[in-house]
Amino acid sequence: MVKQIESKAAFQEALDDAGDKLVVVDFSATWCGPCKMIKPFFHSLSEKYSNVVFLEVDVDDCQDVASECEVKCMPTFQFFKKGQKVGEFSGANKEKLEATINELV
């Protein structure tokens, strides 16, 4: 399951609630073509990796979160463990997304 993040407080709460689990955050926008292309794959990964927390942040709805996380383009995927960022890349690269999850989980 992918959790939609609606606010900075909800983002921080989701990171805190994850504990030791890997958190994968998809920063995207409704007008972004590559974001739309990778979204179904991102959701399928959330079914496959039940021990990983998947979050979605719409950069237009949560500009403060995107700004704090220094997101420059979409889609950007960031990876967190224990509240600390442990990885990041930009672009709709399915292979890299799954490989990074496997590397960090």
Swiss-Prot record:
The modification N6-succinyllysine is found at residues 8, 94. The modification N6-acetyllysine is found at residues 3, 39, 94. The keyword Transmembrane helix does not apply. The active site is at residues 32, 35. One of its GO terms (molecular function) is protein-disulfide reductase activity. Residues 3-105 form the Thioredoxin domain. The record marks 33-34 as: Contributes to redox potential value. Its main location: nucleus. GO terms for biological process: positive regulation of DNA binding; response to radiation. Homodimer; disulfide-linked. Interacts with TXNIP through the redox-active site. Interacts with MAP3K5 and CASP3. Interacts with APEX1; the interaction stimulates the FOS/JUN AP-1 DNA-binding activity in a redox-dependent manner. PANTHER family: THIOREDOXIN-LIKE PROTEIN 1 (PTHR46115). Belongs to the thioredoxin family. Participates in various redox reactions through the reversible oxidation of its active center dithiol to a disulfide and catalyzes dithiol-disulfide exchange reactions. Plays a role in the reversible S-nitrosylation of cysteine residues in target proteins, and thereby contributes to the response to intracellular nitric oxide. Nitrosylates the active site Cys of CASP3 in response to nitric oxide (NO), and thereby inhibits caspase-3 activity. This is Thioredoxin. The gene is TXN.
